């Protein structure tokens, strides 16, 4: 076409190879196509930054990565609230494991990531990031209904436990409980999803240590009992965001403020 010929004259190279079945990009054409994509990405970023300068009414898309119990207890009510109070904001929730979500936050694919920690063991945020504590919630013991409910921490030493996947807050909490009791705990079965853990307990496969939101944000099966004991510690929920000269932008700040308000309104214990 005329536009292609003009482009080839301006860059001094052939960008398309014509074949009987069509046309394909030459090496020079691929370089130009890649450059065009990068320029379009830069323009998108510039448009976003220019829009962020007008923060009188925050608007735009905010992508939030989170684990399941926080999605149910925090983010779903937040979406409902923002739809009424801030319709200019579009919050997109993605259920994601922390190990997958954090690299995406750094790449700009997510704007906020919710994280969980046993007690207050979160190290300082890496450069270019910032962490905001949302809430602390108690760890609870979940016991099969036919089993006698524990009344002290010492009773837990004789229980059979369902372990949580390595690296999760639940796994760290169970390890901490083992150190507190001073005896090795008997574990059987391992799960990552708290709903799976609840199902295992309801089948009589063992006891589990779960945080309040994981227990009460869904339906608690009748086949189990929930016990609160002093000394079990807390799970801390934290939200991480990029922290640079231009971030977080007005839309992300607005969602952060709404998320903090939502967390403060949750009644625990």
Where do the language-model regions lie?
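Central regulatory/effector-binding core of bacterial HTH transcription factors
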Residues: 59-122
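Alpha-helical linker/hinge and terminal dimerization helices associated
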Residues: 10-11, 32-54
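Beta-alpha-beta core module
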Residues: 123-133, 137, 195-245
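Flexible hinge/capping segments at coil-to-helix
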Residues: 126-166
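Hydrophobic hinge/microswitch elements
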Residues: 66, 97-102, 106-110, 116, ...
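A late-sequence structural motif
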Residues: 74, 148-149, 225-269
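A short LG(V/I)-centered, amphipathic sequence patch enriched
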Residues: 5-25
């Amino acid at each position: 076409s005329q536009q292609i010929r003009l482009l080839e004259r301006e860059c001094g190279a052939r960008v398309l190879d014509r074949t009987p079945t069509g046309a394909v990009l030459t090496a020079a054409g691929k370089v130009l196509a890649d450059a065009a994509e990068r320029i379009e990405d830069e323009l998108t970023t510039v448009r976003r930054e220019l829009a962020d300068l007008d923060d009188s009414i925050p608007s735009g898309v905010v992508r939030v990565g989170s684990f399941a119990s926080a999605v149910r207890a925090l983010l779903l009510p937040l979406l409902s609230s923002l739809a009424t109070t801030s319709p200019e904001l579009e919050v997109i929730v993605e259920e994601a494991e922390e190990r997958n979500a954090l690299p995406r936050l750094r790449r700009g694919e997510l704007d906020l990531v919710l994280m969980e920690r046993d007690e207050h063991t979160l190290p300082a945020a890496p450069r270019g990031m910032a962490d905001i504590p949302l809430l602390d919630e108690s760890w609870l013991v979940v016991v099969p209904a036919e089993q006698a409910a524990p009344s002290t921490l010492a009773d837990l030493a004789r229980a059979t436990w369902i372990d949580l996947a390595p690296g999760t807050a639940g796994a760290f909490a169970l390890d901490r409980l083992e150190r507190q009791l001073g005896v090795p705990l008997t574990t059987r079965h391992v799960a990552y999803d708290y709903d799976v853990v609840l199902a295992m307990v309801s089948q009589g496969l063992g006891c589990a240590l779960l945080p309040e939101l994981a227990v009460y944000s869904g339906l608690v099966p009748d086949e189990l009992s929930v016990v609160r004991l002093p000394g079990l510690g807390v799970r801390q929920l934290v939200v991480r965001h990029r922290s640079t000269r231009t971030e977080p932008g007005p839309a992300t700040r607005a969602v952060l403020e709404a998320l903090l308000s939502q967390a403060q309104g949750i009644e625990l214990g």
